[in-house]
Amino acid sequence: MSAKNGSIKLVAGNSNPALAQAIAQGLHLPLTKAVVRRFADMEIFVEIQENVRGSDAFIIQSTSFPANDHLMELLIITDALRRSSARRITAVLPYFGYARQDRKSGSRTPISAKLVANLITQAGVDRVMTLDLHAGQIQGFFDIPTDNLYAAPLMVRDIKDKFDLSKTMVISPDVGGVARARGLAKRINTPLAIVDKRRERPGESEVMNVIGDVAGYTCILVDDIVDSGGTLVNAADALIAKGAKDVYAYITHGVLSGGAAARITNSKLKELVITDSILPTDAVSKAPNIRTLPIASLISDAIARTAAEESVSSLFD
């Protein structure tokens, strides 16, 4: 496959080699030969080992754990490509770390998502491609074209294959995620409910209030990120207590840090479905009730359209 103005080069960082290889296979292209390694003092060294002059280069790199290492890899790969005369550089970020720091959380705190966007731009990236940003307005943090892909079509197909939609309800695990959950509920034509967590008084435990009648329904919790898993597990408990038949969860990015996998395994969640935007840990891979939806085909299609100067948004029309 060739780009409209030059050949396509796919360069993989170390964040998710399996996903990078699957994307390359989907495009029927090899990964560009490159070395991304550490010196003894843990400084990062990058060497592009083939000619990329005039190419349309795509760096495949999630800024997931360890986020700072993977971010630095991205920046240094970008610099290497820029100094090797790549015509255009697109950063393909299946998971954009620091996205949850998209506003000041208190006095004298940073907006780290904006800082990271600036770093990526200043390093020499011409375009960004990412998946299910934590907040849509983060697209505006970049001063370069940014395509935010959506995992919803993949989830919709999986849900339609698996569930009786007449007995299914989509659930937002918090008030902030209502728009995302409503969008999915509309796509599969099911009702919507909300789990509202709040503290009645300072120092008291959070109370989970279910807004909507979930009795007898198979409930599907929808969100963009699952990290510790605490909110998800507590929401599942609240839904079961209100008479839900079963509780499933469809979450785009499985950060699943610390003991999250064990927490999910021992919870009332029937199944957690995540994408492979983040390389799963051994604990996540072995968890009996965590399943992965592959996103390589979606990203491959988006890369092909970008290289051919075709519409990416039409993938989701």
Curated annotation (Swiss-Prot):
Signal peptide location: none
GO cellular component: cytoplasm; ribose phosphate diphosphokinase complex
Keyword Lipid metabolism: no
Pathway, per record: Metabolic intermediate biosynthesis; 5-phospho-alpha-D-ribose 1-diphosphate biosynthesis; 5-phospho-alpha-D-ribose 1-diphosphate from D-ribose 5-phosphate (route I): step 1/1
One biological process term in Gene Ontology: ribonucleoside monophosphate biosynthetic process
Residues given in the record as ATP binding sites: 41-43, 100-101
Residues engaged in binding Mg(2+) 2: 174
PROSITE patterns: PRPP_SYNTHASE
Note on cofactor: Binds 2 Mg(2+) ions per subunit.
Main localization category: cytoplasm
EC number annotated for this UniProt entry: 2.7.6.1
Cofactor(s) recorded in Swiss-Prot or TrEMBL: Mg(2+)
Subcellular location per the Swiss-Prot or TrEMBL entry: Cytoplasm
UniProt similarity note: Belongs to the ribose-phosphate pyrophosphokinase family. Class I subfamily.
Function: Involved in the biosynthesis of the central metabolite phospho-alpha-D-ribosyl-1-pyrophosphate (PRPP) via the transfer of pyrophosphoryl group from ATP to 1-hydroxyl of ribose-5-phosphate (Rib-5-P).
Classification via PANTHER family: RIBOSE-PHOSPHATE DIPHOSPHOKINASE FAMILY MEMBER, RIBOSE-PHOSPHATE PYROPHOSPHOKINASE 1, CHLOROPLASTIC
Name used for this protein in its record: Ribose-phosphate pyrophosphokinase
Gene source species: Bradyrhizobium diazoefficiens (strain JCM 10833 / BCRC 13528 / IAM 13628 / NBRC 14792 / USDA 110)
